Amino acid sequence: MKAGNGFTFKRFHINHDRCAMKVGTDGILLGAWADLANSRSILDLGTGSGLIALMLAQRSDEDVQIHGVERDPAAARQAQENFRASPWAHRLYLHFGDIADFAQKCGQKFDNIVANPPYFAQGVDCRNHARNAARYTAALSHAQWLEIASSLLTEQGTIHFVLPAEQGKTLKQSTALYCVRQCDVISKQGKAAQRVLLSFMKEKKETAYSELTIYDEKNRYTLEFIQLTREFYLKF
């Protein structure tokens, strides 16, 4: 539920007024969908407000550490504040800086890595520089994001991305990693998928395909969407 400058979930609140990209469906879907089985350490690349990291903290065991990396100073400060205000402050860690620099310096591997990366090709700049950086694929391509994530992944670990459908297809074709899960996200029943949730591993496995429709033909939330997100949304 929206509340002033933020968004209130069942077990935590997100302030995002100083973040370029606000709480949105893409991040919520990824935070609810990512498989955390056998996870002892989790990394959120480009954490923004800290939304996905907090969702994964809620879903994971008490001994699991969650690290978020954010390059925008204002967003990083707000994510840190959101972490500290949550029930899981003792196992949430914020790292300020570029994800490529973090990968070179952190000296740690992670069991699960999540990313909701920028997805618009560089074109006409947004008026707000921070929002421009958050939305556009400028400094790093999606393939580079995935390559960085792979360098930080344990041998049996999993990387989870949310992307526009066409860009997800391109990413699958460009990587040597194996896509082990794919969920095509349909905004409304009868329409084509606009988003895709993808999971990658170093180990070869068959891809498990699924679909998720958010709204039915009468603009009501579908049962599958409610079941996926009911531990977070107040309205469910």
UniProtKB/Swiss-Prot annotation:
Assigned keywords, A-Z: Cytoplasm, Methyltransferase, S-adenosyl-L-methionine, Transferase, tRNA processing
Which Gene3D superfamilies does this UniProt record tie to the protein? Vaccinia Virus protein VP39 (3.40.50.150)
Enzyme class comes to: transferase
Checking InterPro entries in the record gives:
DNA_methylase_N6_adenine_CS, SAM-dependent_MTases_sf, Small_mtfrase_dom, tRNA_Adenine-N(6)_MTase, tRNA_adenine-N6_MeTrfase
Known EC number: 2.1.1.223
Q: Is the tRNA processing keyword given for this protein?
A: yes
Pfam families with a match to the protein in the record:
MTS
Q: What's one GO-annotated cellular component? A: cytoplasm
Q: Tell me, what is one Gene Ontology molecular-function annotation carried by this entry?
A: tRNA (adenine-N6)-methyltransferase activity
Q: Which GO terms describe its biological process?
A: methylation; tRNA processing
The record's subcellular locations are: Cytoplasm
Major localization class:
cytoplasm
Q: Which reaction does it catalyse?
A: adenosine(37) in tRNA1(Val) + S-adenosyl-L-methionine = N(6)-methyladenosine(37) in tRNA1(Val) + S-adenosyl-L-homocysteine + H(+)
Q: Which PANTHER family match?
A: TRNA1(VAL) (ADENINE(37)-N6)-METHYLTRANSFERASE
Q: Which family does it belong to?
A: Belongs to the methyltransferase superfamily. tRNA (adenine-N(6)-)-methyltransferase family.
Q: What does this protein do?
A: Specifically methylates the adenine in position 37 of tRNA(1)(Val) (anticodon cmo5UAC).
Protein name listed in UniProt: tRNA1(Val) (adenine(37)-N6)-methyltransferase
Origin organism is Actinobacillus succinogenes (strain ATCC 55618 / DSM 22257 / CCUG 43843 / 130Z)
